[in-house]
Amino acid sequence: MTQSQYRPGPDANGLFGSFGGRYVAETLMPLVLDLAREYEAAKADPKFLEELAYFQRDYIGRPNPLYFAERLTEHCGGAKIFFKREELNHTGAHKVNNCIGQVLLAKRMGKKRLIAETGAGMHGVATATVAARFGLPCVIYMGATDIERQQANVFRMKLLGAEIVPVTAGTGTLKDAMNEALRDWVTNVDDTFYLIGTVAGPHPYPAMVRDFQSIIGKETRAQLQEKEGRLPDSLIACVGGGSNAMGLFHEFLEDESVKIIGVEAGGHGVNTGKHAASLNGGVPGVLHGNRTYLLQDDDGQITDAHSISAGLDYPGIGPEHAYLHEVKRVEYVSITDDEALDAFHATCRLEGIIPALETSHALAEAIKRAPNLPKDHLMVICLSGRGDKDMQTVMNHMAAQEKQA
């Protein structure tokens, strides 16, 4: 495969192969075209890049460590496992990498109001954080179901000055929150910047979010070179929309010796229908401004996604992931709720790190694979977020298990 096949752009129409694009209402088309122009100009502006680097270093706290997970490695008895510690960022996840980039772009474009959608609440918190830092009003759309299971993050957003709009339509989760945010954007096109949290949405969002997250992979390459003197043998990251994964993967797509694994949320199992594994259990379609793999019924209606992790509970996936799946550069697998919970507990007890439930899906896949790999195999997992937000979910699950016992 050539570079152009693995890293195809996107092209001028926002397409990665047949995925991506700009499927938006007529009222939004001038806005997304303007955003694409502004983003291209910003990328070429040394002042913008200098300001971005300043905030990455002094506000987010980058670079974060590449940590050798010694006890987990011993426990698995195979591959040498490293964690890219995105949970050590300010706000506790990878989301802020993207939010800082987009808020600087909003400021450059003269926008006076931020809106965002959130599932687990981490993107909402990161958006509220940068809104506070830059003195901008901020409205966060969040599904009512997610508000119930992410009370701590809802409170954090309010503390930071954000207005939370509960979304009761549909299943009251991330898909529905994104629908409402898009409606707001159509209504308030002049002064509002829509800060999308993942590598989805109409072009230029998938490429722009990937670019702001690609610092994860760039740092990983340099840090592993320093520690081990070579490339990783495998990369593993969880995939909902897929921004933490794209941030880690993109840097290594041309390095064919590096095996790349994306981990979807298998829920109760892909064969049960109660999951959020768009690539393993979906078909191509159009949602939220782009063509990608989606969970759909026989009539083409979007079906409900399920995952114990609110951040993976989305019935689609970023279009670049769909492309990488089709060209077979990245292997996409699924992990069930129970497997993710087991990995969550193992990481807590072996490494003294409480990972997010999203991240626990990647950890579960690593724990499955590592024992069958040689001891000199270098495996990097994106530790995309910390698990403070998931305490209630885990407590509820443990209480339910005790009742059954």
From Swiss-Prot:
It is an enzyme of class 4 (lyase). Its EC number is 4.2.1.20. It catalyses: (1S,2R)-1-C-(indol-3-yl)glycerol 3-phosphate + L-serine = D-glyceraldehyde 3-phosphate + L-tryptophan + H2O. InterPro entries: Trp_synth_b_CS (IPR006653), Trp_synth_beta (IPR006654), Trp_synth_beta/beta-like (IPR023026), TrpB-like_PALP (IPR001926), TrpB-like_PALP_sf (IPR036052). It comes from the Bacteria. The keyword Translocase does not apply. Pfam families: PALP (PF00291). GO terms for cellular component: cytoplasm. Keywords: Amino-acid biosynthesis, Aromatic amino acid biosynthesis, Lyase, Pyridoxal phosphate, Tryptophan biosynthesis. Its cofactor is pyridoxal 5'-phosphate. HAMAP family: Trp_synth_beta. PANTHER family: TRYPTOPHAN SYNTHASE, TRYPTOPHAN SYNTHASE-RELATED. NCBIfam families: trpB. This is Tryptophan synthase beta chain. It comes from Pseudomonas putida (strain W619). The gene is trpB.
